[in-house]
């Protein structure tokens, strides 16, 4: 038993990895070193204790025409002769292949360099230098180019990356690299985009008598949009068309229009958004105006979705373009028409998530990102709306099923309206477990449209130029004193310019002699507005040209009378 226990303990030591199990003779090491170049690389790498790039602002998001600064840190175990260090600034596009046969191989990736600029920061290949053991720091700075750049992107089908790379070269050994990626964002201003037109889709029941005539008239008035969701659904609804109207045509839905739609059994849906561009984190308000031919309600009648369409081109065959759709966020609202007018106005909101890519168009090269606001109208009570996890939206069973997307809601639920029961959900915004729009489009009496929007990085407010107004010229403004408002208020209470001039002379006791003061047009502008007054200007000319002797004599007489009333001082 004692020998068996010793054997078990020895086996346990061997399984744990005792040092004796990994001993390699020096002869084997020398022979491997002479045969393998990988050992040479590891031998060069064994000299390095630390080799990294430290940016001065690591977490900063950079923009074009800015300068990146940092330090290359190198800590060596001992002296290394004949080395040189290069610094490279690289930007690269990369595409991933969808072919499962080439997954994991070099053919599964295709890359193209946006730019590559390099320079030597220590030594050169023609003139290598010596590095002593210890820590070395090499500061650097490189400017980001301002042309032909796009924002940093990393998604399933590809990526756009930018980084700073340091290369340590030595003679007869492969170089050693270290990288430091950074985020680049190209500013896209959405403040200059124009206001979009109102888009309208009109559906007509197949039971209508003048179905064909009505549809032909609508098609002549406006052209259908191939991007709209209604294009593949009109065959099921009997007839429909999409019209793009101006802002003035949105107010034509009166009683006569409603009666005409009721006679033709036509449903008219108009969608309006305030602008075409939005920034990351903003809300997209979507206003939907529905005119029905009868009273209608559905707890999930309107679904608005922010959709990203990605088009990836094949670099080896530019004619092959793959299109991918991704739903970013979604808004659901109930549809209830008024019992009398059969109309409804619903406001939905879509908030652009913070991790959304900006709109991108690389001119048929690599990939493109376009965003659309897609609105679907469910015009049948029989159509049930489900999410991707088969959760019923707007049904009686949703009251007992917890909604995982409630914590992602961007605004509070609206109050119940009309015949809405407690179990039906009100308008809400989803960021996960979205409604399966493709499944909903296959149902009857479902139509929709889409409006392209631009997702940018910022919005600059451009104030409109104010109309020109008549103002004082700069010469007359410079002549006005600082207390011109106080002088103007005092002069406005005077009875006439003559009385004002007399009061001014009478109350000036300690100043210079009033006889030397002669009023001119410039003096009078201090007391009156700059606008010319004909009556006052005529009297002012007469007053300026007359003699001031009468006013001066009265002043002297008053001063003499005041001195006579004073008692004379006794003589000394």
From Swiss-Prot:
Pfam families: Arrestin_C, Arrestin_N. It comes from Kluyveromyces lactis (strain ATCC 8585 / CBS 2359 / DSM 70799 / NBRC 1267 / NRRL Y-1140 / WM37). Residues 237-257 have a biased composition (Low complexity). One of its GO terms (biological process) is ubiquitin-dependent endocytosis. Residues 221-257 are annotated as: Disordered. Coiled coil: none annotated. The lineage of its organism: Eukaryota, Fungi, Dikarya, Ascomycota, Saccharomycotina. GO terms for cellular component: cytosol; plasma membrane. Belongs to the arrestin family. PalF/RIM8 subfamily. One of its GO terms (molecular function) is protein-macromolecule adaptor activity. SUPFAM superfamilies: E set domains. Required for the proteolytic cleavage of the transcription factor RIM101 in response to alkaline ambient pH. SMART domains: Arrestin_C. This is pH-response regulator protein palF/RIM8.
